[in-house]
Amino acid sequence: MYNVLVFGMTENPGGVESFLMNYYRRIDLSRFHFDFLCNSYDPVAFEDEIHAMGGRTVHFTSRRQNPIRFRKELESFFARHAHEYQAIWVNVNSLANIDYLKMAKKYGIPKRIIHSHNAQNMDSRLRGMLHEANRDAVGRYATDFWACSEYAAKWFYAGKGGRGEL
């Protein structure tokens, strides 16, 4: 069994969440197991379906709500459970927070996928600046660079020569 830790689910059943569930519904569950990291204690979109399919949802304090508690909870989870996973698949709209990739590398998850789902900053100016700062840094933590479009690859991976797999 290949165990994958997935980040990208929120309470909103939007584009990224629907993409992940479409993928999860079609994956061979006899070969792959998905667990989902959720940066909120509220139920995420499709949570009941995830559980019914055998997946687990792991909830954390939001970094925005309490950055110190977020970091402590994240560190604790990875210290206890990273050895259970062969991959982490981080699905995001910006690189403002790459803590999941950093922890995955620190605790030895061998395959670390970053997947871009956006082609421009749709958030605050601060998150835009964090995205820019992390564009070059992400190459130290991720092993694989995916994107939903050429534009998304260029916006995320400009520091990597626009490298991204569609």
Task: Label each residue range with its predicted role.
Residues 21, 128-134:
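Charged helix-capping and loop-helix junction motifs
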Residues 141-166:
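A short, active-site helix/loop in glycosyltransferases that binds the activated sugar's phosphate group
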Residues 8-9, 62, 91-93, 116-119, ...:
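Histidine-centered beta-alpha loop that forms part of the nucleotide-sugar donor binding/catalytic region
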Residues 2, 6-14, 22-69, 163-165:
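N-terminal strand-loop element at the rim of the active site
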Residues 74-91:
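Mobile, glycine- and charge-enriched loop segments
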Residues 63-66, 95, 107-128, 143-144:
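A short, histidine- and acid-enriched strand-loop-helix "catalytic/donor-clamping" loop
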